[in-house]
Amino acid sequence: MMGKKLAVDDWTINDILELYVSNGLFVDQKYQRKLVWSLSDKELFIDSLIKKFPIPNIMMVEYNENEKITYGIIEGLQRINAIISFMLEEFPIVVNGKSGYFDITATPSTFDLQQEGKLIQKEPVLDKQICIDFRGYKLPIISTSHDTKTIDEIFKRLNSTGTKLSKHDLRQAGALNKFSQLVREISSTVRGSKTLSDIVTLETMPKISLSNSGLDYGINIENVFWRKHGILTEDLLRKSRDEEIIAILLGAFLLDRPIAVISISVLDNLYDANTEDGKIADDKLVKCYDNIKTLFIQIFNELDLIYDETDISISEMLFASDRKKTDIFMLFFKVMLQEHFECKAIGDYQDFADTLKNSKGSILNKFEEKTSSDYLTENNTVRLISDIIGSHLVEVESYNPLVNEVVSRLNLASIETKYTEYKIGFTYFHSPSKYRYNEGRLNFKNVSQIAKVASAMTNIKRDSKNPGMIIVGVADNESGYK
């Protein structure tokens, strides 16, 4: 690491592009949300740069590891992504009344990508001089190599005013205790955006961000748990309301308190390991971090299984109207937590879903009775939900956390290839007719390849928390096999 400094440097847009192409730009997900700008946001920002309007500072932390200097984006991810997206032909911009794409012959980096067949010029093309002027725009970038604590403080002060981040985004950003880490892990797993490390290349970010209108990348937002089940609006999901819900549920579980008393101040305390609540939560997580993570993800997975089997969403099961959706969902999840903690699971998904669907009116009425305190209302509603679903629960063996890990790795198949290998199976299948006698027999060549991959994985330097994994496909039935 180089000596400490905090200076505003004038980097050109071309400098940023060259860093991106050489994989020299990284994103620390402890600080940065996923990509959230819409196409119109990006177009407006690029228009500002072309018109040479001033823009806010961008903050990066500089690393010098093995004599290679790289930069982590602490503040300004959305702006840098807009610049790179425009220069890589993802969208056109209107200049002087004419729409056009960036001229990729205007910079050496984009021209090289074109020559390598990695970038194709789209039509119509902007005037080359406009693109040359654009690449020369000087960006106000704060580069620093301060310690993590100082970077945290700088980041929070940068975002302490305005509407850059939601209250929860700011609470979560830069928090390093076990509670915040677990909220991040559960949330990203449920969203389908979990990565093996918090630090990823800028190139990876579009693949793990929620899709946006007019932008062809990322995770289809309508397929995400919270949207698929009608719990959150698209706007609330982009503002990290899903993370806040998980933080409330996790806080209530760890502190053994009603959901109703997990206030904003309690949440703030949970993110601070120096507070009493923060210490209680982190002390418990030292002993059972992985077990609690598995428990939460298991429930989310089971709720998805209900939908897959019955085509009935949580919204159809629980919500009689749009009122108090998240409150009712959290109480339902609390009941599921209690039951799964006692090693119980749903026996008949269809009957379970139908019973809840037919009872949702009484659940809502019970919840909206305001003759008692919120604590008593919560208890009464939890008791009612428990009574309704109790007859549908069966005793089960303890859950294997490896199931969650496999699902997470499969979701990462397009971006995480170093630590995971995917094999279609151990046997021959769909062989040409003259080799049909091999059908169903053990494929020794494939077994040998798997052994070689396993041997190679042992020689890869990696975090001990992320072991190498070989996932082999197995058909559920004969039709799946064929």
Enumerate the language-model features and the residues they cover.
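Basic- and aromatic-enriched surface patches that contact anionic nucleotides/nucleic acids
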Residues: 2-14, 28-251
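Conserved N-terminal catalytic/coupling substructures associated with nucleotide/phosphate chemistry
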Residues: 130, 135, 274-482
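Intrinsically disordered or highly flexible coil/loop and linker segments, enriched in small
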Residues: 54-55, 163-167, 192, 196, ...
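Polyanionic (Asp/Glu-rich) segments that form extended negatively charged tracts
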Residues: 192-339
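Active-site-adjacent bridging/hinge elements
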Residues: 17-22, 51-60, 216-226, 413-433, ...
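N-terminal extension/subdomain marker
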Residues: 1-20, 369-383
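Short, flexible beta-strand-to-coil junctions
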Residues: 61-66, 145-148, 252-257, 341-344, ...
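Short, cationic low-complexity segments
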Residues: 163-182, 272-281, 361-367
